[in-house]
Each structure stands twice: as C-alpha cells, then as structure tokens.
C-alpha cells in the first residue's frame, strides 16, 4: 500500500479508504489511486486485516471447470470430505473453461488467504501463481497439469483409457471408428484423442480425418458430424466419445438415426446402464482423484518439501452392451 500511496501522491489512509470503498475521497483522487493500483498490480489481502502474519485461515480453495458436471461434482465432494476431516472449510468456484475467470478466481481466493488451492487448469501459463506459491500457499493441480508451474498433479490415465476403449471396439471387428471429442487445446481431450490414434495405429488401421469431430459438445455440431461419419461407403461402424457430455449428445442424435452403431464413452454418467442398449464406458474415479489431490495439498500445508509428484489414476472399461455390438 505504501507503493500505491507514493505513486498516487496520497497518504496510506486515503489508499485504504479507496480500497475498502469508504467515503470521503474525491473522484479525481480515487481515479489516481485506482490507476496506481492497476499499474503496480496491487491486490487487497482481506485476511491480512484480520490475521497475524504467518497464521492459518483453515480454508482451502477448489477451482473446477464446471461444478454442474457430474465428474467435477464428485471430485468436489471428495475434496470437501478430506478438508472437513482436517478441520478446514472449502471454497469452490467454476472457471467455465475461461482462463481469465480462472485467474480471477485463483487470485481472489489467494487474496482471502486460503491456505491451499486445488485447481483444474485452463490457462496456458500458470506462472502468475508463482508468487503465491513462494509466499506459502500450497497448490495442487488436478485433472490436467499446469504450464509454467511445478506442483503436485493428479490425473486420470486418459490416453491409456481411450486406447483400451478403441482396442475393445477393434476386437469386436470394427475398423472404421469415429471419434468425437472436446476442444483439442484441452489436455484431457488431446490425451484421449492421442489414445484413439495410438490404438488405431497399433492395429494397423489408418484414420480418415473425416472420422474425427473435435470441439465443444454442441448438439447441432455433433448431429452434423454424425451425419458425415455415418453416411457413404466409408461410414464408420463404431464411435468413441471423449467425455460424458459428448456421449449424451451423441446418444440423443443416434435416437433419430436408423441402424445400430457401436459406441464407447469416456466418463460414466447417470442411467448409462438403464438405456435400451446400456452404454459401455471408460470410467474414471473422481472420488479417488479428489481425495488424493486433497491429501497431497494438506501434506504440503503441513510443510512437506518433497519433490512434486505426478500421480496417474487408472481408468476402468465397463462393458454394458453398446461397445459390444459387432461390425
């Protein structure tokens, strides 16, 4: 705050009033203070007003892609259970796959002096968290690794799980297998696509790029992709879906299409076993991932200084019927 006061040419009390939204400061002076804050990158530390330096708040933060997603909902529940067992409160936010929102949430949590953070990364570079890490905030990455920051990381075996699913379809006699996945800029989407390509290559099968559809799981786009994949002499006979939202959108679209197409989805989802043709899936274990990430976080918060770990949690192929339809 001293630097802000000096840059704005005002006293510390004036800066404090502006930062805390108190009256008694002219608009022109407040503008100068805000300009200095932006230039210097100052952020109010709410906890510092209440706590002695070096004390703990017994609060941790969790930043997910979308709390409404069943996968992340289970992961959040597991983290919360571990936090509670350690006497800590969990704050949760959704980034909506927006790097700017992720950064804003992350730094807001840090400004409120959470003791640690578990983050599903979306940004291309997480170097902005280095000062927080150096200041003693524990950080763990989950579901995807962070770029520009070396921290404990908990992942699912995305590539291996996708390769196992495609290999299973190949063993049912399928050679032309379509793949529908999320934005390939997302780590999990890229890994699962790589697993698909790996399994096809290991079986000696080429991949026609027309068999691929990558992007956000929008119903219209998925329907158009399926029209392309399922028509013509080289139509695919089986489909691999890269996440649960894509699988659900594909199933809705297939309900209007004639024929029976084999399908395996990555991620389990509610009622997948209750459909007319139960859905074969690659099941992740979000509860285990959440527990392991949280335990790593609390070990760091207790002062553990060991080298950062990268843990990969195995997936499980659950055979239910849709992936066993023959060519």
Please name every model-derived segment:
Residues 165-203, 309-324:
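An alpha-beta-alpha
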Residues 80-129, 144:
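Central regulatory/effector-binding core of bacterial HTH transcription factors
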Residues 38-71, 75-77, 85-86, 108-111:
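N-terminal helix-turn-helix/winged-helix DNA-binding helices
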Residues 1-56, 327:
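N-terminal helix-turn-helix DNA-binding module of bacterial transcription factors
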Residues 32, 70-85, 161-164, 187-206, ...:
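Short, solvent-exposed amphipathic alpha-helices that sit
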Residues 223-327:
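Flexible loop/turn connectors
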Residues 152-179, 194, 198, 219-227, ...:
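Hydrophobic alpha-helical segments within soluble ligand-binding/sensing domains
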Residues 119-164, 185, 245, 267-279:
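Flexible loop/hinge segments that line or gate small-molecule binding clefts
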